[in-house]
Regions:
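Compact, glycine-rich, soluble single-domain proteins
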Residues: 1-116
């Protein structure tokens, strides 16, 4: 995994620590077996257009982005043992439940992952 930040296109940092899944195994594992994300943490998976919370013990907010980083869909507080997806998405960002709302994210926002 590579550590970076999630920024809005203007350059403002939204989430200080966002890990990017670099390989197929990391993408498949996702957050399984990992501790709950803190409010200042996230997990970027690309390519990815669906996620599940099977075997997880906590809820997540899920962002679906296209290749340009445009936010297409927000799934708030996806409970354990659920699935969600979006055919046209290229990447997902997983974050702690409630963070999408707390950050004021909206459909159409342009998001960028930047390495630290």
């Amino acid at each position: 995994m590579t550590k970076g930040q999630l920024n809005i296109a203007s350059g403002e940092c939204l989430i200080e620590t966002v890990y990017r899944a670099d390989g197929a195994l990391e993408r498949m594992r996702g957050l399984l077996g990992r501790e709950r994300l803190a409010p200042d943490q996230g997990f970027w998976i690309a390519p990815c257009n669906s996620v599940h919370t099977f075997f997880m013990t906590y809820s997540l907010d899920i962002l679906f982005l296209n290749k340009e980083g445009i936010l297409l869909k927000i799934v708030s507080e996806l409970s354990p043992w659920r699935m969600t997806g979006m055919i046209s998405a290229w990447a997902t960002v997983e974050m702690s439940a409630g963070q999408a709302r707390a950050l004021g994210l909206s459909i159409g926002d342009k998001l960028v992952w930047r390495a630290c």
